[in-house]
Amino acid sequence: MLACNYLMCTVLAASFAGAVPLPREGVAFTVGLGLVSGAMYLGGFLLLQWNIARNGVVLSATFMKLGVLVPTAMAMLIFGERPGAVQMAGMLLAFLAILLINLERGSQKAASRAGLVLLLLVGGSTDATAKIFEELGQAPLKDTFLLITFVTALLLCMAVCIARRQSLTGADLLFGLLIGAPNYFSSRFLLLSLNDVPAVIAYPTYSVGTIVLIALLGVWLFHE
C-alpha cells in the first residue's frame, strides 16, 4: 500500500513539475535534497512501524507528531525566525493540543525510549527539508524537489517490498492511491505556505490540521 501511495504522489508531482521550465541554477541542490528527503520519508515510516510494535500506537503517534519541534526549532535557531507573543502562544497551544489529542487515548510505558526519540528526530527532520528548500533552494524547482522526493521514496519502498517478498493486493492498490493524493497535496501546500507564513506557525498548524483531518475522517468513515 505504501508503494502505491508513493506512486500516486510521484504521478501528481510529475504532472506539476512537467509544466514548468527548469532553471539551471540550483538543480544539483534540489536533486540532492530530494534524495535525502525521499530516503527519510521511507525511513521515518519504517521507524514508525518498528515503534508501534515496540511502544504501541499512542506513544508512537504522539512522538511522530511532536517531530514538528525539529523544523520549528530549526527555523528559530538557524534561520532566525522570531515569533511574537501571539505566535508563541499559538505554538504552545498547538503542541499542547498534539499531546492532549494523542495521550488522551490511553497511557502506556515505552519499551524503547531511544526509538521514540529517534522517531521524533527523523520525522521532524523529514518535515524540515521543506523549510531548508524554501530558504536555500530555487522556488521554480519546488515541484521538481517534490518529484525527486517521492520517486526516491517509491524506489526504496519497492526495494523493501521485494526484499520482504510482499505481494500487492487490490485493497493495497486502492487505498494506497487514495491516500497518495492528500499526502502529496499536504506536502505541496506546506512547501507553498512557507513562502508566506513563518515556519514557527506553519509547522504546528500543519501538524494539528493533519490530526483534525484524520479525526474527521475517522468519524465519517469508521464512526469512531
Where are these regions (language model features)?
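Polytopic alpha-helical membrane proteins, predominantly small-molecule transporters/carriers
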Residues: M1-E224
